[in-house]
Design a protein with these regions (language model features):
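Conserved cytochrome P450 K-helix E-x-x-R motif and the immediately C-terminal K′/meander segment
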Residues: 2-19, 193, 275-314, 335
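N-terminal membrane-proximal hinge/A-helix region immediately C-terminal to the signal-anchor transmembrane segment
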Residues: 1-78, 93, 97-105, 137-141, ...
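Cytochrome P450 heme-binding "Cys pocket" and the immediately downstream C-terminal segment
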Residues: 258-260, 374-409
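Cytochrome P450 heme-thiolate monooxygenase catalytic core
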Residues: 52-60, 75, 91-245, 263, ...
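Conserved cytochrome P450 K-helix/beta-meander segment immediately N-terminal to the heme-binding cysteine loop
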Residues: 48, 310, 326-353
Length: 422
């Protein structure tokens, strides 16, 4: 339970006691954690069929059993190849304008001069980006229907349900599990209706769902409806909460560090009145700022895998069915890698390219987050859009603290700030 409540503190205490690599004894067997970059390289460089996702029994009921995050081996390779194109290159950049549009719409509703938790707005921006980019939903009535159904589903997934499987019982239609099942049934119905309508009308479109439906495996077959549904649920769950939370942490830092805020605003202002998404994405200090946000408060404290067959890690042999985790939160706060690691300093990235074995906010290797490039792209455009028109001051003297929020870690108070127009 200590890990579930505050994994940053829990893992940090273990490293201070045992060093960069240590083993936890859990009810599921040995759980090996490493924050040694040389060993991280070994984990990420291992053949893809060395591992499978861990713990699948925790995530499966919420993401769908055929989710890319849960698949392994040949199925993972095939699905990842099919799903990759919309999240990279020109396909991804085509969504820049709609990210800015969604951000402007929500910024216009933010109370000015009053204490406001900013995380809900950031997650609303992220959700609207998903609705537009993934589902092609722009109409206000349809947007509200989708938004309500998705939020009901997301809010029904509580940390208790995730970490205490014994709670996953219907109890005659009452209780948290019954609420989750009911919300998921409504979301499933909406997703299947959309998938089948697209297939029936041969209306694929240029949104991510359309690209998935039109994509084909090497043998010419398409992804089945149930598999498409599980990928869409994963995109919503993984994309909505995570990017919105990183944006909220971004505002927290901007509200507390005037020099950082001013430097970022100066860079964004210099791009002109209507900068292109490409110009925003190429801004160097903005890139460094986003890297630093994800270093200090990574959304996931570690990247864990189950060992499929015995695996050699350094001088140790990890048995099958044990787990291996890359300690992201430990790597990111290692003073040997990042001097003064608890200081928020975007400039540390201006002359340093992130090492994939020292900086792992999106995991690494063959299972690196499929949407990593899209998430960074969205962060940059949303932040540039926001800082052009608003400034923030903190509502509390003490900064927000990381706390468990469903699967991920986020600010305990939603980041309380006061917004003012520039």
């Amino acid at each position: 339970m200590a890990y579930a409540q505050n994994p940053y503190r829990f893992l940090g205490a273990l490293r201070r006691r045992y060093g960069d690599t240590f083993t936890l004894r859990t009810t599921k067997g040995p759980f090996v954690v490493t924050a040694d970059p040389a060993l991280v390289r070994e984990v990420f460089a291992a053949p893809p069929d060395t591992f499978r996702v861990y713990p699948a029994d925790v995530l499966g009921p919420f993401l769908g059993e055929k989710s890319l995050l849960l698949s392994h081996g040949e199925r993972h390779r095939r699905d990842r190849k099919l799903l990759t194109p919309p999240f990279h290159g020109g396909r991804m950049r085509a969504y820049g304008a709609l990210i800015a549009e969604a951000t402007r719409a929500h910024v216009a509703t933010l109370p000015i001069g009053r204490v406001t938790p900013v995380q809900p707005m950031m997650q609303a921006i992220s959700l609207d980006v998903i609705l537009r980019a993934v589902f092609g939903v722009h109409d206000p009535v349809r947007t509200e229907a989708w938004r309500r159904t998705i939020l009901d589903d997301v809010r029904a997934v509580t940390p208790a349900l995730i970490f205490i499987p014994q709670l996953r019982r219907p109890l005659g239609g009452f209780g948290p599990w019954a609420r989750h099942l009911a919300a998921r049934a409504r979301f499933d119905a909406m997703l299947f209706d959309e998938i089948r309508e697209r297939r029936r009308d041969a209306r694929e479109g240029e949104d991510i769902l359309g690209l998935i439906l039109s994509a084909r495996y090497d043998d010419g077959s398409a992804m089945a409806d149930e598999e498409v549904r599980d990928q869409l649920i994963t995109l919503v769950v993984a994309g909505h909460e995570t990017t919105g939370t990183s944006l909220a942490w971004s505002i927290d830092w901007l509200s507390r560090l005037p020099a950082v805020r001013d430097r970022l605003q100066t860079e964004v202002d210099a791009l002109g009145d209507s900068p292109s998404p490409e110009a925003i994405s190429a801004a160097t200090y903005l890139d460094a700022f986003c890297n630093e946000v994800l270093r200090v408060f990574p959304i996931l404290p570690d990247v864990s895998r189950e060992v499929v067959r015995p695996f050699t890690l350094g001088s140790w042999t990890i048995p099958a069915r044990a787990a291996v985790a890359v300690g992201t939160a430990l790597l990111h706060t290692d003073p040997r890698l990042y001097p003064d690691p608890h200081r928020f300093a975007p400039e540390r990235w201006l002359d340093k390219k992130p090492s994939p074995f020292e900086y792992t906010p999106f995991g690494g290797g063959a299972r690196r987050c499929l949407g990593a490039a899209f998430a960074i792209y969205e962060m940059k455009i949303a932040l540039a859009t926001i800082v052009r028109v608003l400034r923030f001051s903190p509502a509390n003297e003490k900064p927000s603290k990381p706390a468990r929020q469903n699967i991920t870690i986020g600010p305990h108070d939603g980041v309380l700030v006061v917004a003012r127009k520039r």
